[in-house]
């Protein structure tokens, strides 16, 4: 079991969000402060925004990234999709955002601040092993995840069956199995 091999810390993304702190750059800065406290290389696993943060960290701190598990990642933000998404968000009730730890206004601010993110030219800085995953039904992120895998020098792509974007909710057993198999392959 991977949990027996590693000291695991599982921060909640909302821990990096403070009042008036809902831009990507501010959340990323808080995330870096958190990760840089650890003296050993960190093994990062992130879903969606968490995957973007983990990838960004491995680019900026390649010596500190031991491995990455990126679930439903984007490396070049789909600007048009984000704009459509933000229009839809404006019509959604505030209650829809509570489960993800954001208020509606802050979530819209965050997604707007991410529109210009593009790590394409910096992907060669990622030196650690990377497992890229996507749910088989995640039509929005699957192509980007497959493309990202091809652009990284030490990456493997896995599709998680019977799941959409929230792989951890849709097929937690499949997710754990894929991570543990990958951990064994790269000797984590």
Language model features: what each stretch is:
Residues 20, 163-172:
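Catalytic histidine-centered segment of alpha/beta-hydrolase-like enzymes
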Residues 9-43, 177:
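Active-site loop/oxyanion-hole signature of alpha/beta-hydrolase fold enzymes
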Residues 139-145:
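Conserved alpha/beta-hydrolase "acid-adjacent" motif
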Residues 126, 132-134:
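Short beta-strand/loop motif that positions the catalytic acidic residue
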Residues 169-183:
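Post-His helix in hydrolase/transferase enzymes
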Residues 95-121, 137:
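Hydrophobic, aromatic-rich cap/lid helix
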Residues 24, 52-55, 59-60, 67-94, ...:
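Flexible "cap/lid" loop of the alpha/beta hydrolase fold
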Residues 46-51:
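Conserved alpha/beta-hydrolase "nucleophile elbow" surrounding the catalytic nucleophile
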């Amino acid at each position: 079991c991977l949990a027996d091999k590693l000291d695991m810390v599982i921060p909640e993304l909302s821990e990096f969000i403070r009042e008036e702190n809902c831009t990507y750059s501010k959340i990323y800065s808080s995330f870096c402060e958190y990760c840089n406290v650890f003296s050993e290389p960190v093994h990062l696993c992130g879903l969606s925004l968490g995957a973007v943060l983990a990838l960004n960290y491995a680019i900026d701190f390649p010596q500190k990234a031991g491995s990455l598990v990126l679930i439903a990642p984007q490396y070049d933000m789909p600007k048009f999709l984000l704009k459509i998404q933000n229009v839809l968000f404006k019509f959604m009730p505030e209650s829809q955002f509570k489960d993800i730890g954001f208020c509606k206004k802050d979530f819209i601010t965050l997604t707007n601040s991410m529109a210009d993110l593009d790590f394409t030219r910096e992907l060669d800085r990622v030196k650690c092993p990377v497992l890229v995953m996507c749910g088989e039904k995640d039509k929005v992120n699957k192509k980007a995840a497959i493309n990202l895998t091809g652009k990284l020098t030490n990456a493997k792509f896995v599709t998680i069956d019977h799941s959409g974007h929230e792989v951890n909710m849709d097929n937690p057993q499949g997710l754990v199995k894929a991570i543990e198999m990958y951990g064994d392959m790269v000797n984590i």
